[in-house]
Amino acid sequence: MMRSLAHFINKALEILCISILALMSILVFLNVVLRYGFNSGISITEEISRYLFIWLAFLGAVLAFNENQHVSVTVLVNKLPPFGQAILKFITDMMMLICCYLIIEGSWIQFQLNLNNFAPISGLPQGLTYFASVIAGILVSAILITRLISTIFFIFRGEVK
């Protein structure tokens, strides 16, 4: 059940990222054609593309984190025995969970502060850019919590992956 929910969320994020990238590409291409071909443009596309890019970066980071595609230095980890690797994984996941809390807290404050500041052309609240990091922080925290539970389970059962 939990694995299928995680798979569903992962697929939904992939589809959302693909959709955001496609929409961004269309908006930017349309604006370039209008500017250079017809000497006019749609000014709102720049703001919307910026907002979409921010959301794409944060949601893409969640996808990369979920699939262990982020950069990591494993020189020390690979030399440890499996139990030591599990302990180190637990410690690093706990530290990342603390960082996620700080990101969520700071981004939530910025979201609230900037909710009444509006973009000049589109009129969208500028707090939406900070809300992307809140959502990303929550999703990464959920991934970390499931990893921590799995690591604890394997450490205490003596079955270390």
From Swiss-Prot:
Task: List the keywords (alphabetical).
Answer: Cell inner membrane, Cell membrane, Membrane, Transmembrane, Transmembrane helix, Transport
Q: Where are the transmembrane segments?
A: 13-33, 51-71, 86-106, 135-155
Task: Output the Gene Ontology cellular-component terms.
Answer: plasma membrane
Recorded GO molecular functions are:
transmembrane transporter activity
Q: Which InterPro entries match?
A: DctQ, TRAP_DctQ
According to its UniProt entry, one GO biological process term is: C4-dicarboxylate transport
Its subcellular locations are: Cell inner membrane
- Does the record carry Phosphoprotein as a key word? no
Q: How does it sit in the membrane?
A: Multi-pass membrane protein
Q: What is its main location?
A: membrane
Sequence similarity:
Belongs to the TRAP transporter small permease family.
Task: Please give the name of this protein.
Answer: Putative TRAP transporter small permease protein HI_1030
| Species of provenance | Haemophilus influenzae (strain ATCC 51907 / DSM 11121 / KW20 / Rd)
